[in-house]
Amino acid sequence: MQESLNSNDFKEYAAKKAKHITSAKNIAPLLECIASLPTIPSHFYSDNGIHIVAQDKTLAQKYHKAIYTLATQLKPWRKGPFFLFDIHIDSEWQSFMKWQLLAPHCNLEGKYIADVGCNNGYYMFEMLLQGKKLYKKIIGFDPSGIFKCQFDFINHFINAPIEFELLGVEDLLAYSQAHNQSFDVIFCLGVLYHRFDPINTLKILSQSLNKGGELILDTLIYESNEEICLCPAQSYAKMSNVYFIPSIPTLKGWCERANLYDFEVINLTPTTTQEQRQSAWVDSQSLSAFLNETQTRTIEGYQAPLRGYFKLKKR
């Protein structure tokens, strides 16, 4: 998205994009079903997942079948888990494991926050609790219709003051300019290796931050001390949309080109089948099918997934 659009033109563009996504024949009926769900006052908390507790358990039980049926229609559930009343939405990723790594390094109070590639909003619900409601605003960006449906479904019961924009990272700077507001903290988790243009992506993230603003970055890392980058020929761990997996020195150089400094390595951790695994809520293969028999290499013969978690600042 070109950031040269004026505010009104960008907002019109964003509205048209959202309408196109939400009017798709596989998405519109789901959104209608979500909107027709009963109001069930609830509260939520985090404990190895997001737990949603109904204040009126009789009312929740009355609509159990309808809620459960709709939840299954919203598959695949990649991020979670969610414990919605007595329904355990056992997502492919145990996302709380990532959040527990990141949370001690995130000061969200009083911050204007973006979650780029927010999926179904799992991490935004965690941020909401982490920020103790003293944040300025939390906005998620993801152009996926099914993830928007999942977010709306969960938030129907949580009723959290979170915004979800059906926009991609390429739209972030234009969004920021159209709303005359840069971000204090941007989360970009599991997005960079899916981009054709990782340096430009980092520049967009940097340009969308306030001076001194923080980027919390999660990306696949190639284990090497050299300034090199893995560019998979066809696929990586059966993902055909993985294009660049940098070493840490390479990633640091990319970030400096994007005016992102104070490069802090929060954690380096291999992805395990404890964190990512097959589930009845996904209906597809997962990590164990993407690795060799000893789980030391991908099925293509590359290094097994190693995730790096980083914190950077814009100068």
From Swiss-Prot:
GO biological process: tRNA wobble uridine modification
GO molecular function, one term: transferase activity, transferring alkyl or aryl (other than methyl) groups
SUPFAM superfamilies: S-adenosyl-L-methionine-dependent methyltransferases (SSF53335)
Keyword Transferase set for record: yes
Top-tier EC class: transferase
Cystine pairs: none
Domain of life: Bacteria
Binding site for carboxy-S-adenosyl-L-methionine: 79, 93, 98, 117, 142-144, 169-170, 193, 307
Coiled coil: none
Keywords: Transferase, tRNA processing
Catalysed reactions, semicolon-separated: carboxy-S-adenosyl-L-methionine + 5-hydroxyuridine(34) in tRNA = 5-carboxymethoxyuridine(34) in tRNA + S-adenosyl-L-homocysteine + H(+)
Signal peptide: none
EC number from the UniProt entry: 2.5.1.-
CDD domains: AdoMet_MTases
Subunit structure: Homotetramer.
UniProt similarity note: Belongs to the class I-like SAM-binding methyltransferase superfamily. CmoB family.
Reported function: Catalyzes carboxymethyl transfer from carboxy-S-adenosyl-L-methionine (Cx-SAM) to 5-hydroxyuridine (ho5U) to form 5-carboxymethoxyuridine (cmo5U) at position 34 in tRNAs.
HAMAP family, per the entry: tRNA_carboxymethyltr_CmoB
Full protein name: tRNA U34 carboxymethyltransferase
Organism: Helicobacter hepaticus (strain ATCC 51449 / 3B1)
Primary gene name: cmoB
